[in-house]
Amino acid sequence: MQRTWKTLASAAAATLAAALLPSVAVAQAPVKIGVVLPLSGPNAQFGINSRTGIEMAADAINAAGGIASLGGAKIELVVADVPSPNTAAAATQRLVSQDQVVGVVGAFVSSITLAASEVTERAGIPMITHSFADQITSRGYKYIFQVSAKATTYGKAQFDYAIALAKQAGAPFEKVAIFYEDTAYGTAQAKGLREAAKAAGITPAIDEAYPLGITDVAPLINKLRASKADIVFPVSYFNDALQIIRAMRQQKIDIPTVGGAAGYIIPDFKKGLGEYSDGVFSIAPANYDFIPELNALYKAKHGTFMTHEVIMYGAALHHLAKAIDVAKSRDPEKIRDAIAALKICDTGFAAGIPGGCTAFDATGLSSTAYPVFVQWRGDDLVTVFPAKAAKGPAIWAGKTLN
């Protein structure tokens, strides 16, 4: 697999996977992998981006010859559009029972992943996800794997990184506001924020959930203004992220804003807000400036930078494909064991994840990934913290930090 990754920058065709080097004369039946994502509804853009990463990885593996140990069998993606948790179980069951997939990748939205993984666990089918919620790998399940850190880790880092930068800028904060969408992702990440604030001796001036799909953020923003908070930590998907930042800017609430990933770190955030996005910080699970050569190839084709979902789900598919190759089998149990044992580092999509690897602990949680801080600068997101990962300086309260 390593050889193909080394040719990424120069390959004319998109080569975004490891070379599995088969040489066979007889065509093998494809290896079916299920893909569960919200391709319609309010989170469709996340699902579309995630599917792009999965398809890029699968296409390149197939172009390189397929799964070597299975005689060059090609990967066949079986995609299910799952816009809400209510449809996740039935859609995933169809993939397992009718399509007989050997593994599943998805579903970005934590509440959808929680529902889908109930089905894969009962069926004994491995699933790899980038969803954040702590519950995903805290249920004692055997067949679910998270390529990212968990949500409370992101929440804690979201707060602790902000404290570090504010202190460096000579502008420490005392009054904080926490807003979060009320599904599994937002609730878990807000818990991490809350715990970090408590550890710092700070009681949030605002700590408020709002419903997913909110259409009027005016009450939240009015509370923010009245609180006289020094900083705000919103944990949002996409439409809610746009509404919160737009309302803040329109009401000239000019305080450091640290988003909770998701809607704050995709190109559509900039498209939707224009100059209002400038200077906004966010926690992030990955960033394209870790893999500039891959990003250049992606941008030439898609016109935007490679998003975190593309990186994380490309890495997830790559890990699953390598596990199938190592297992030398279509048996989901053997594939599951190979997923758990594998550690893939510093190659392809995995290099775009802080920590540089896809690898898992005994619970299925990533054993290497950690969050980074990114900041909007014009059309770009720059990784600015921690120092070991930074690709540029942070600008905090108007001060450029070294």
Give short role names for the model-derived ranges:
Residues 14-15, 25:
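Cleavable N-terminal signal peptides
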Residues 20-27:
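Sec/Tat signal peptide C-region and signal peptidase I cleavage site
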Residues 2-11, 27-402:
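Extracytosolic ligand-binding ectodomains
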